[in-house]
Amino acid sequence: MSLNDDQLQALAYLNRGCNVFITGSAGTGKTHLIRFFIHDQHTYGKQIGITATTGAAALHIGGKTLHSFMAIGLAKKSAEALAMQTMTKNKRTAKKLRALDTLVIDEVSLMDAELFDKLSAYLQIIRDDVRPFGGVQLVLCGDFAQLPPVSGSYCFTSKVWKQANIKLAKLTTPMRQQDDTVFFSLLERARWGSLTEEDMETLRSRVQATESFPDYIVPTRLYSVNADVDAINSQHLQDILDKGETMQQYEPKYEGGAEAQKERTRAWATSLGVPARLALCRGAQVVVTYNINQEDLVNGTRAVVEDLSPTSVIIKLKNGVRKVISPIVVSCDDDKSLRVTYLPLKLAWAVTIHRSQGLTLDAVQMDLGNRIFATGQAYTALSRAKTLESVSIISLSPNAFKADPLVLKFYGVSQ
């Protein structure tokens, strides 16, 4: 595994034991550097926690989701309550965290400031060490110019970020778009919300463009809102059903005695993204929506339905491995009376831009119109592609590309 000059500079910080935030444009080799560092640390017998804020990102680096590794559930309780719970009821995790040398957090840009501070306090208590994150070396990776946290403020605004003396390591060499440097330069301007009129003309040339896609490649469609994604997926499913395949429907089971309790459970499950009804058939493109295991069935795993029964589904992963998916039982972290049983799959001919973060797509179609609602969203979608020719744009708005002023200030970018 070779590294470029930017990556070697970042590695020098890491090897000195510094807390480091590895950042850069999409496709500049951030995850590659993380993998290199992890391999390096293992050879020296270091205890390293390999985590990411999303299941899909965790899969890329061979780790676990941050919440799973830390055993903090939904992290709704205080740091003190979470630490006490771990030390009394999950002593194995407490022992693991006390022995930890380094904590890797990929896609840290999706974490809000409140959780960042809470995790630091949590480790301080468990490790009995008042230093930020209990003295554990932090290796953070992400890009604040991409998608912001779902709620709350950026973690770089937290108290602990300043206290931890985190070094900034910027990667600038394109890896994903290395064969299309013109496209990479356009993406850099899109990252900061400073596209030129020439850039917009270039993007307009890709509106409804599909000539570069071979017939057997169906571009993955990216949308900013779930409603658009649902419409595309429903149409593709119907196309398969029209050819004679049989549909199987799966409905969640909401536990609770009284009807009012079931309604509470239903509302809670909906907030988790559990659909009221899931329709599948053989040939359906799906995505796993829950971290079933830490190896190959995590939130974000893509697959195709090979067979199905009233109680389970057989899916085929991208690597050809077949897996049986059965309903799972999920309970609320703060109220164990809230329990739902459901099949953790979702149709995936189209996906939201949020779910696409971290992917590299050879053929991608996206909506960059007026439905873009978050800073960094359009840039995240566009930067999934390797080349401009691999992009087809459904609709385009000049207002779609915007950067948060806080992010511009953090990176020292002036406009």
State where each predicted segment sits.
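Conserved ATP-binding/catalytic motifs of P-loop helicase motor domains
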Residues: 1-415
